[in-house]
């Protein structure tokens, strides 16, 4: 599939992975209200790779995710953006349909005789086995995000985009969700681009951490820390300090 909107060329399908990249972005420009939100941005994500994206508010993180997901066709832009057609998106708000039970939320849009079985398996994977008939209102915020993850991964996407998916959760629930998300991604192996404001979250989850500044990728470094990634290790502290310094935040112990 190919589309050209305002000078931005987007391609998808099998060609997206011919060069062993799931996402490839070259010289991407996005203009909103006369301001260049993304300015000559370049980024590549390999199959199964987990990339976290940091940056100040207004740096263009959500704009980048929307561009990759092709959710903003009316925005002026240019450059090359290659991504697969089968993309799932997880938002900070779980966005469950309140009038549908959990299983119905998960299998929404799925087809085939095994759709319900796949939905049940997906709910079991996120620790909600036996809750298929529950209503979204009966769940905590963390449980609702578990359903959102199940709904995204039941489709076995090549690419998972996540826009601050745990931003509204308490600290303990966030830690539990980090563990769950890593386990799910290791099992399903999508490429992942996750936006966050939390440096510790970025380090905990990522194979690579990138920082977006003034519409460009200013930092893109691998996270070469073995699990579990503990705050007290010198390697963790050095990486955390480096990222915080680039973001203009003084490190605290």
Per-segment meaning from a language model:
Residues 54-56:
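The feature captures the beta-strand-to-loop junction immediately N-terminal to the Walker
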Residues 135-139, 143:
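Conserved ABC ATPase signature
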């Amino acid at each position: 599939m190919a589309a050209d909107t305002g000078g931005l060329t987007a391609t998808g399908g099998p060609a997206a992975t011919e060069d062993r990249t799931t996402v490839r972005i070259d010289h991407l420009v996005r203009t909103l209200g006369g301001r260049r939100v993304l300015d000559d941005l370049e980024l590549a994500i390999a199959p199964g790779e987990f990339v976290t994206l940091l940056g100040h508010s207004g740096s263009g993180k959500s704009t980048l995710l929307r561009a990759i997901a092709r959710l903003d066709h009316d925005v002026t832009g240019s450059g090359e953006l290659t991504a697969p057609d089968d993309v799932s998106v997880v938002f900070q708000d779980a966005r469950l349909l309140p009038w549908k039970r959990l299983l119905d939320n998960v299998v929404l849009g799925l087809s085939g005789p095994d759709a319900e079985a796949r939905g049940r398996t997906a709910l079991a994977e996120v620790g909600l086995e036996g809750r298929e008939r529950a209503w979204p209102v009966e769940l905590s915020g963390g449980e609702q995000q578990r359903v959102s993850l199940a709904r995204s991964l039941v489709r076995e996407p090549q690419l998972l985009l996540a826009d601050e998916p745990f931003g509204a959760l308490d600290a303990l629930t966030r830690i539990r969700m980090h563990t769950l998300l890593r386990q799910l991604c290791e099992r399903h192996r999508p490429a992942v681009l996750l936006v966050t404001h939390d440096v510790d979250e970025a380090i905990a989850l990522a194979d690579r951490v990138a920082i977006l500044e003034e519409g460009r990728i200013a930092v893109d470094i691998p996270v070469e820390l073995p699990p579990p990634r503990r705050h007290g290790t010198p390697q963790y502290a050095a990486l955390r300090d480096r990222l915080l310094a680039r973001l203009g935040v003084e490190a605290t112990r």
